[in-house]
């Protein structure tokens, strides 16, 4: 039989105090909705239907082309949300997973175990449950003396006795698809919230003598539903520990994993060393035996093997093998550094390609440049690429030496093996093998300093 999935993502999330739909808030670099969608993939659903509502266009954009969408114009409860999927799923034979889009910590393994449990026990409905010493706010699982599930009771509708129950409803279920939609026709809004509860379907199945079961999570953290910023931070913390643990098991060394922030899609090879307060975001890839020191921040970039990045920022760029960056360097978007390049302290590179073995040791700005191999930039070199309206390109050949405190005004080209004298302002092309000096000639005036107030003779 086929598997189907319904993801509930219509809510506004008032307690988030945000204009962004709740399910689009990010955990470890991707939205909560994307986390849930990826985990749902473990059951290989034939159809996945996502229920949208508040700012539906934003939610649909995230999963465009990956799921079908239905709209819940009025948020009248979880049961009502599932009713919205009726035109797509009613009458199909199979098992349907119903899950909230704000549960980013649920794993694909747990969902696979849940649906296997449901099938193996021939249940018409199976509830994913968890146990906690502090069940306040959760729906409780009410069982009979034979430990069979009788019903789910919400916090606001629970008796004092029922509030003591520690087994809670996680809000995730598997149903026989055909029976689900038949039962939904019989639920009502006779409850404290005046909503259609999906949980009422469980009571209907019990009344008709059909088999209802519960599969209990091994890890309570997976049950976390995010309703406010506090829970969002908790989810981020748990996810970060999972991610870092995975990398450590795969041969990555962390000085302080609790102070290291790595997004879920980051790839790290073995033998990488990561110090504290390192952040790796987006689609970043780190090659083997690279060292990332305290304070390094890398976004959507590729760093090769054997590189050393010291307390620096790299954004949307590529860094080849053996490169040294930092401390306090900034590699801005659309830059590429060739093998063995050295970008030192207080150097900024923007939108530039730099050939292998090139060095810019300190206090340099390289913007909109095409730089060859074995180039040396002296301290204080500035490439001037912007005239207030347009940006221009500088081309620097191989084996070029640029003296300290030089200004290179684009558009200009420095030929192979050329040399720029220290302190020069370059406004014209420099031919290959030439030396360019663009500064005033030094003049010495003998004894002139004796006329000045600072001279000892005038004290």
Curated annotation (Swiss-Prot):
Q: State its location(s).
A: Cytoplasm
Q: Name one GO cellular component term.
A: cytoplasm
Entry keyword Transferase: yes
Region Pyrophosphorylase, annotated ranges: 1-229
Q: Which InterPro entries match?
A: Bifunctional_GlmU (IPR005882), GlmU-like (IPR050065), GlmU_C_LbH (IPR038009), Hexapep (IPR001451), Hexapep_transf_CS (IPR018357), NTP_transferase_dom (IPR005835), Nucleotide-diphossugar_trans (IPR029044), Trimer_LpxA-like_sf (IPR011004)
Q: Which Pfam families match?
A: Hexapep (PF00132), NTP_transferase (PF00483)
Q: What is its main location?
A: cytoplasm
Q: Where is the active site?
A: 362
The UniProt annotation places Ca(2+) binding at: 102, 227
Q: Does the keyword Acyltransferase apply?
A: yes
Ranges where the record places region N-acetyltransferase: 251-459
Task: Tell me the Gene Ontology biological-process terms attached to this UniProt entry.
Answer: cell morphogenesis; cell wall organization; lipid A biosynthetic process; peptidoglycan biosynthetic process; regulation of cell shape; UDP-N-acetylglucosamine biosynthetic process
From the Swiss-Prot or TrEMBL record, what is one GO molecular function term?
A: UDP-N-acetylglucosamine diphosphorylase activity
Q: Enumerate the NCBIfam families for this protein.
A: glmU (TIGR01173), PRK14354.1 (NF010934)
* Homology family: In the N-terminal section; belongs to the N-acetylglucosamine-1-phosphate uridyltransferase family. In the C-terminal section; belongs to the transferase hexapeptide repeat family.
Summarizing the function annotation, the protein's role is: Catalyzes the last two sequential reactions in the de novo biosynthetic pathway for UDP-N-acetylglucosamine (UDP-GlcNAc). The C-terminal domain catalyzes the transfer of acetyl group from acetyl coenzyme A to glucosamine-1-phosphate (GlcN-1-P) to produce N-acetylglucosamine-1-phosphate (GlcNAc-1-P), which is converted into UDP-GlcNAc by the transfer of uridine 5-monophosphate (from uridine 5-triphosphate), a reaction catalyzed by the N-terminal domain.
Protein name according to UniProt: Bifunctional protein GlmU
Q: Which organism is it from?
A: Streptococcus pneumoniae serotype 4 (strain ATCC BAA-334 / TIGR4)
């Amino acid at each position: 039989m086929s598997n189907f999935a319904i993801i509930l993502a219509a809510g506004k999330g008032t307690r988030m105090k945000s204009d962004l739909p709740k399910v689009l808030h990010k955990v470890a670099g991707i939205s909560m909705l994307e986390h849930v969608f990826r985990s749902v993939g473990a059951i290989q659903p034939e159809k996945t239907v996502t229920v949208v509502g508040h700012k539906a266009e934003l939610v649909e954009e995230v999963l465009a082309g990956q799921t079908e969408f239905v709209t819940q114009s009025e948020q009248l409860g979880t049961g009502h949300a599932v009713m919205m999927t009726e035109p797509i799923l009613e009458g199909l034979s199979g098992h349907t997973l119903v899950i909230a889009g704000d549960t980013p910590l649920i794993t694909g393994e747990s969902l696979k175990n849940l649906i296997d449990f449901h099938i193996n026990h021939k249940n018409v409905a199976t509830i994913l449950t968890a146990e906690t010493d502090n069940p306040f706010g959760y729906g409780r699982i009410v069982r009979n003396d034979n430990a069979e599930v009788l019903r789910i009771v919400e916090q606001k509708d629970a008796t004092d006795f029922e509030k003591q129950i520690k087994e809670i409803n996680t809000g995730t279920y598997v149903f026989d698809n055909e029976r689900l939609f038949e039962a939904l026709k019989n639920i009502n809004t006779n409850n404290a919230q005046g909503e259609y509860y999906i949980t009422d379907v469980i009571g209907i199945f019990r009344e008709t003598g059909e088999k209802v079961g519960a599969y209990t999570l091994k890890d309570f953290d997976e049950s976390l539903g995010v309703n406010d910023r506090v829970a969002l931070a908790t989810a981020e913390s748990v996810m970060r520990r999972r991610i870092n643990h995975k990398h450590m098991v795969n041969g990555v060394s962390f000085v302080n994993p609790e102070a290291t922030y790595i997004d879920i899609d980051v790839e790290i090879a073995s033998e990488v060393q990561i110090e504290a307060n390192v952040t790796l975001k987006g689609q970043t890839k780190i090659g083997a035996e690279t060292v990332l020191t305290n304070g390094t921040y890398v976004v959507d970039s590729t760093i090769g093997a054997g590189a050393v990045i010291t307390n620096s920022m790299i954004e949307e760029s590529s860094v080849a093998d053996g490169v040294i960056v930092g401390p306090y360097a900034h590699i801005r978007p659309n830059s590429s550094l060739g093998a063995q390049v050295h970008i030192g302290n207080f150097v900024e590179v923007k939108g530039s390609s730099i050939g292998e073995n090139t060095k810019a040791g300190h206090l340099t700005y390289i913007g909109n440049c095409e730089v060859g191999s074995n180039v040396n930039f002296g301290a204080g070199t500035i490439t001037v690429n912007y005239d207030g309206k347009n940006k221009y390109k500088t081309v620097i050949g191989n084996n070029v030496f640029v003296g300290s405190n030089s200004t290179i005004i684009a558009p200009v080209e420095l030929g192979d093996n050329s040399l720029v004298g220290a302190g020069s302002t370059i406004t014209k092309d420099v031919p290959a093998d030439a030396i360019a000096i663009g500064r005033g000639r030094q003049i010495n005036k003998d004894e002139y300093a004796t006329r000045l107030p600072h001279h000892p003779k005038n004290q």
